[in-house]
Amino acid sequence: MINRFSRTQRVIGRDALHKIQRAHVIVFGVGGVGGYAIEALARSGIGKIDIVDHDTVSLTNINRQLIATDATIDQYKVNVMKERIHTISPDTIVNALPIFYLPETKDQFDLSQYDYIIDAIDNVTAKIDLIVTAKSLGVPIISAMGCGNRFDPTKV
């Protein structure tokens, strides 16, 4: 039977696809890195994804972020991304959380419930705290080491 993930299944196999479809992932950051990661997960057939970002789409995001268009300016990035994911993979459960992850807000998250954590945060303090917390819980974390807001890469 052909379905939206039949080609993925041909590449990785039925068991691996079912594992992806049962997975629960959280992504922190819905910007230039996180947006692409979230969309790739949806196109791979992820079962459940929580997306976290307190920011809204701005005009300056249009050159590099999937969700940024004139029509989405001033909307929460997580809400725009949730709508986009539902057009790609309607069976994916998406929880949109417009929260700024910081050491002070981390108690709002039970990170132990996730199969994987993706860190696409551009705040160094938050990034370090998230990595340390994930490691202490034994939850695998994939961390993007971008240089958001840096203009001279030799100083990163």
Pin down the residues of each PLM region.
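Conserved SAM-binding strand-loop segment of SAM-dependent methyltransferases
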Residues: 71, 92-101
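Short amphipathic alpha-helix with an adjacent loop that forms part of the alpha/beta core around
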Residues: 104-113
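Glycine-rich phosphate-binding loop and adjoining beta1-alpha1-beta2 segment
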Residues: 46, 51-89
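Hydrophobic/small residue at the entry helix of a nucleotide-binding pocket
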Residues: 33-34
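E1/E1-like adenylate-forming module used to activate ubiquitin-like modifiers
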Residues: 116-156
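N-terminal charged helix/coil linker that caps or initiates catalytic domains
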Residues: 1-26
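Conserved N-terminal Rossmann-fold NAD(P)-binding element of oxidoreductases
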Residues: 27-29, 52
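Aromatic pocket-lining residues of Rossmann-like dinucleotide-binding sites
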Residues: 41
